Amino acid sequence: MKSLLREMTDTDLQRCLEKIRNKQYTFIAAGDNGKVYQIDGEDKVFKITGDRDEYEIAEILVDRANEFTTFIPVYYVDGNNMYIVANADTLPAGLKKEIDMFMDDFAFFSRDEGGEVSIFDFLPDAGELNPQIENFLTALQTDIEKLGVSEFDLDFDFRSDNIMMLNGKMVMVDW
């Protein structure tokens, strides 16, 4: 049953693509490199990104939600700059605050280490973390290693604004 929730049928995909072609969507957010739109009447959104590296990661993730559980499920990539993903919920304020504090501490750690360190290098020195955040970071590290993208752990955009909730679990929605 879990895998069915993470998959998208061809019929669902075609319906979403038709709605995108017919401009049946609503703008919901913009970030540094792109814009996100809610597809009318669907629990899916699509993103148009100007960041080639971000798009290349989406290409790796497409139809692999069961393998990469810490990333938002990617259902479709268009071969250019658009991809369709699940619609997720906002990160609760308490988790957002704890992740922001973790990142503030990481910034000090990074400076002390002279840069070129990842959040995973910091994890053993982070002190006591919320178990939900610690478990997410451990699983995220495993997923990033499975991606096989050289130095992605140093380059990905880990911050609370890029994490949302899907089915009660944290997922990266931007990277």
Regions found by a protein language model. Give the residues of each.
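Non-catalytic localization/regulatory regions flanking kinase domains
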Residues: 1, 69-70, 171
